[in-house]
A protein has these predicted regions:
Chain A
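ABC family nucleotide-binding domain
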Residues: 3-5, 11-214, 218-223
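C-terminal boundary and immediately downstream tail of ABC-type ATPase nucleotide-binding domains
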Residues: 224-250
Length: 250, 325
């Protein structure tokens, strides 16, 4: 069992509506997998089940061979290993960029101030924002906020990073800087599970693409294969829709 | 005025223009300077717990000025009306001045009641409001019942229940040291307990609504980096919510300064109590209550000033009123 992440027949309902209808997939270390699919297909729910911001109804999720969906799993320990980047950034609004990054290091990992600061500054530099370390979120652009969000997740040294539509709240001209950071992470071997319709990123960085529709993975494969020879009707129509929406995209 | 900013770079509106700021600042310095000197004088320099304290300013010149102006007004006929009024001002001062030392002592208790009760009430209000917003059903219900019970009944009734209806008074009276020297007597302690409980309920409401105005994604993000729920509230939600709560909370402080006058009904010798007892003895109701009103006004304006400063010190770009851009 060398998979870093194994998702096994996960089901999740909200009331009467079943959002996830038996999802299974696995990721190796260093994989960059992208979940695509129409809105409401369960992509974000799937991500949130992995770090247990949402509790699954049935099925199992293994991180590094360990079942993390048991009742006695320490969710806070799990979340130390699984970072998350949010669509609307969710930077801690009262803290500077640097303190956004150090909070987890100080209060979760118990590092002292100097150590935390050193790590934070290294991560802020990695996303190109060391100069903005003392800025508050309200003083940053959307793209900068999201890069701080990535630095905050990276600082915890996670085994897996989850990205929940990291660029969809951004103005188009700010998408590039975030995608660039993500592509850098991918090339450095970070294991990433990404919900995104940013096809530029998918083509350049994704190992595999999972197409979700109506709570199921209807097709999976390398992006080039799926783009060129989509087998499933849903995949075809979805990718066509994306291409026209993004003006041809390559 | 050049544009001022706080330590964190949030712009602050310029405040009052220069000369009004100077006059206001002078008035505050005079009031607080006199008050503090009076307290120190009456406790340490000429301790005289029995009463009969001499005012710093003699009454004689004011009486004399009143006399002179009155006779001047008389001699001028209709033209003397302004002098008549001016004479009234001196008569008012002459009537008020002898009560100032007692009012200063009363103001001390008013300040103590307010500051101690608002602070202790805050300590209770934070967990209460967190319980209201983030607690389970049981906790939410307990917190809701408490706040509604306290906010739904008269403060005076609460004080009477505590003072006359429970053993609290006897219990506190038997605590060694109570009522000796600088330690206030049991009525003051009961009043502090009553105001603390009452204020906690109101403060909890202000903080509760501030908590709900913090975006839910903030706690989600805190949980996502591995913070527990309580830690997430402590380190992420509360620091923001308390900033949002400052304007409403300041209101509660101002109310409490004035509501503290209800302590007179359980025999606490605070500002209102001193005023009323002197007025009853001297029949100088106008002088006494107008002067007491000016005391309360000065206390309230001071509290507003302090809270404005607190708001400026704690301002963060993007949070709270002064942070809006």
């Amino acid at each position: 069992m060398s998979d870093l992440l194994r998702v096994d027949d996960v089901h999740k309902s909200y009331g009467d509506e079943e959002v996830l209808k038996g999802i299974s997939f696995e990721m190796d270390r260093g994989d960059v997998d992208v979940l695509v699919g129409p809105s409401g297909s369960g992509k974000s729910t799937m991500l949130r089940c992995i770090n247990r911001l949402t509790e699954i109804d049935s099925g199992e999720i293994y991180l590094d061979g360990e079942n993390v969906t048991t009742p006695d799993t320490d969710v806070n320990a799990l979340r130390r290993n699984v970072g998350m980047v949010f669509q609307d950034f969710n930077l801690f609004a009262h803290l500077t960029a640097r303190k956004n990054v150090t909070l987890g290091l100080r209060k979760v990992k118990g590092l002292d101030k100097a150590e935390a600061r050193e790590i934070a500054d290294a991560q802020l530099e990695r996303v190109g924002l060391l100069a903005q370390a003392e800025s508050y979120p309200a003083e940053l652009s959307g793209g900068q906020k999201q890069r701080v969000g990535i630095a905050r997740a990276l600082a915890m040294d996670p085994k897996l990073l989850l990205f929940d539509e990291p660029t969809s709240a951004l103005d188009p001209e700010l998408v590039g800087e975030v995608v660039e950071v993500m592509a850098d992470l991918a090339s450095e071997g970070m294991t990433m599970l990404v919900v995104s319709h940013e096809m530029g990123f998918v083509r350049s960085a994704a190992t595999d693409m999972f197409v979700l529709d109506d709570g199921k993975i209807v097709e999976r494969g390398a992006p080039t294969d799926l783009f060129e020879n989509p087998e499933h009707e849903r995949t075809k129509s979805f990718l066509q829709g994306l291409n026209s929406a993004h003006g041809g995209d390559g | 005025m050049s544009e001022r900013t706080t330590a964190r770079g949030v712009p602050v509106d310029g405040g009052l223009p220069g000369w009004r700021r100077a006059v206001g600042g002078g008035a505050f310095a005079l009031f607080w300077g006199w008050l503090v000197v009076r307290w120190i004088h009456d406790w340490f320099i000429v301790p005289n717990p029995a009463g009969d304290r001499t005012p710093f300013v003699p009454v004689g010149p004011f009486d004399a000025a009143n006399e002179v102006l009155l006779s001047l007004a008389d001699s001028l006929g209709v033209l003397g009306v302004p002098f008549d009024w001016l004479a009234g001002v001196f008569a008012f001062a002459a009537g008020a001045i002898p009560s100032l030392p007692a009012l200063a002592q009363g103001a001390w208790l008013t300040v103590v009641l307010t500051v101690v009760s608002i602070a202790l009430g805050f300590v209770l209000a934070v967990p209460l409001s967190v319980a209201r917003v983030y607690g389970g059903l049981g906790l939410r219900w307990v917190a809701l019942s408490f706040t509604e019970l306290i906010r739904g009944t008269p403060l005076l009734a609460q004080l009477f229940v505590l003072y006359y209806g429970t053993n609290l008074t006897v219990f506190i009276r038997n605590v060694p040291g109570v009522g000796m020297g600088m330690v206030p007597d049991q009525a003051v302690w009961v009043a502090i307990i009553g105001f603390t409980i009452n204020s906690a309920a109101y403060q909890a409401e202000y903080i509760r609504s501030a908590l709900t105005s913090v975006h839910s994604g903030q706690l989600t993000a805190a949980r996502a980096i591995g913070l527990g729920k309580v830690e997430g509230i402590r380190y992420v939600v509360l620091p923001q919510a308390l900033r949002y709560a400052i304007p409403g909370w300041s209101n509660e402080l101002i109310y409490l300064i004035k509501y503290s006058s209800l302590a007179t009904f359980i025999t606490v010798g605070e500002l209102f109590n001193q005023t009323e007892s002197i007025a009853n003895d001297t029949y100088r109701y106008t002088e006494l209550f107008v002067t007491a009103g000016l005391f309360y006004l000065a206390l309230v304006l001071s509290a507003s000033l302090v809270m404005n400063s607190v708001e400026d010190w704690t301002a963060i770009p993007g949070i709270g009123q002064s942070g809006e851009r």
